[in-house]
Amino acid sequence: KLDMQLRKVTIETPLNLILDKERFNVRQLREYQNMVYLLDANGIFVFDNLGNYKRKLPVTGVNYINFQDNELYFVQDGSLHFVNLYTSERRSIKLPKPYATGLVSDTRLYLFLPKQLDFYAWQ
């Protein structure tokens, strides 16, 4: 944790105690609803806003995560997966192409290939 007034780190969490240091490959770090989500080759690690480890979502092959309302979402193995942040309930939508990642809004779904963007109406 960083104290902005003192401009100094007040709490540190050593990740090598949690992550497999042989496969340590952080791809993304996001804060959402007072939690910190670290996307790594080993999965999605969830920490509270003080850096305390909470849980791990065992997903691999994911390059990007994002959030919509109370769900975390990501593209994996040809599907768009949603995980409820509070109940851990999962749902998936099969995608028509092998998209790399996607963005979800209230009314649109944006899906990305290496050289193409497709978007769909979304409800």
Task: Give residue spans per PLM region.
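Short C-terminal domain-edge/linker segments immediately following a structured domain
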Residues: 67-70, 75-77, 88, 103-105, ...
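Surface-exposed loop/turn elements that mediate protein-protein interactions on large endomembrane-trafficking
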Residues: 1-21, 40-59, 78-97, 117-123
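Hydrophobic, glycine-enriched assembly/anchoring segments
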Residues: 101-123
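Repeated scaffold domains used in trafficking and secretory/extracellular systems
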Residues: 20-32, 59-70, 96-108
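Residue-level signal for tight coil/turn positions that link beta-strands
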Residues: 33, 41-42, 69, 77-78, ...
